[in-house]
């Protein structure tokens, strides 16, 4: 994992969602821990992190339906990192107003994890 000061919002969200969706951790515990760890971030950034994590989890079934409508490989068969990146990005595109449809940080997060 990168140094905390170098992590972007989306990398923090990705790590949190991996813990919750792929490792089965409780969302409220993961989010509490993450928000305490990054309490130095501005409130707007912490709100974005929390809203994106909670929204992705709450809309997971619909998001998976949308992804499965377009993807050759269905979500249950995807690698966990790819599945989580797609869920996070799909949530942002469908539900958040002020997020660009294509975000460089998604690519960067994927590149840093190989």
Question: What residue ranges belong to the model's regions?
Answer:
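Long, amphipathic alpha-helical "stalk/connector" segments that mediate intersubunit docking
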Residues: 3-29
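Hydrophobic (often cysteine-bearing) scaffold residues that line and stabilize catalytic clefts
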Residues: 9, 45, 82, 101-104
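Residue-level signal for inorganic ion chemistry
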Residues: 13, 49, 108
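Short acidic alpha-helix initiation/capping motifs at coil-to-helix transition points
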Residues: 25-27, 98-104
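Conserved AdoMet
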Residues: 33, 37-97
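Conserved small/polar residues in nucleotide/adenosyl-binding loops
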Residues: 105-114
């Amino acid at each position: 994992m990168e140094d905390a000061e170098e992590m972007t919002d989306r990398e923090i969200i990705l790590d949190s969602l991996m813990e919750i969706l792929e490792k089965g951790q409780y969302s409220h515990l993961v989010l509490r821990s993450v928000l305490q760890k990054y309490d130095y971030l501005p409130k707007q950034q912490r709100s974005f992190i929390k809203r994106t994590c909670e929204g992705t989890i709450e809309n997971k079934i619909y998001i998976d339906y949308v992804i499965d409508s377009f993807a050759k490989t269905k979500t249950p068969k995807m690698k966990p990192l790819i599945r989580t990146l797609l869920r996070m990005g799909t949530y942002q595109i469908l539900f958040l107003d002020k997020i660009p449809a294509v975000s460089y940080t998604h690519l960067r997060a994927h590149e840093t994890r190989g």
